[in-house]
């Protein structure tokens, strides 16, 4: 009588709360190493967003001037060889 319910998909960028970007403050800027066949020092930052969620965001480009307390704009998009990094 009612039929099957559609599955509700999981949102990949939940911390953005549906926004295209979200502003945040860097709490820690550091480098990390990628998953197995790759080798590098990838630049990442822990960012506390205005939605009160703390996420790990990748810092794209060749150089950056980010420090603790820097204001950043975070967008969705994962880095395939860094586990847990789903924002840029």
Curated annotation (Swiss-Prot):
Which SUPFAM superfamilies did the record assign? Answer: Nucleic acid-binding proteins (SSF50249)
Its Gene Ontology cellular component terms are: small ribosomal subunit
Keyword annotations of the record: Methylation, Ribonucleoprotein, Ribosomal protein, RNA-binding, rRNA-binding, tRNA-binding
One annotated GO molecular function: rRNA binding
Q: Please tell me whether the keyword Nucleus is annotated for this protein.
A: no
Gene3D superfamilies per the UniProt record, alphabetical:
Nucleic acid-binding proteins
Per the record, the similarity remark reads:
Belongs to the universal ribosomal protein uS12 family.
Describe its assembly: Part of the 30S ribosomal subunit. Contacts proteins S8 and S17. May interact with IF1 in the 30S initiation complex.
The name this protein carries in UniProt is Small ribosomal subunit protein uS12
């Amino acid at each position: 009588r009612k039929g099957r319910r559609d599955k509700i998909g999981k949102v990949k960028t939940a911390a953005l709360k549906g926004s295209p970007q979200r502003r945040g403050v860097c709490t820690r800027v550091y480098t990390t190493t990628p998953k197995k066949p790759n080798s590098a020092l990838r630049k990442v930052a822990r960012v506390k967003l205005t939605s009160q969620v703390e996420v790990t965001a990748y810092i794209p480009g060749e150089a950056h001037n980010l420090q603790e307390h820097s204001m950043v704009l975070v967008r969705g998009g994962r880095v395939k060889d860094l586990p847990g990094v789903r924002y840029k």
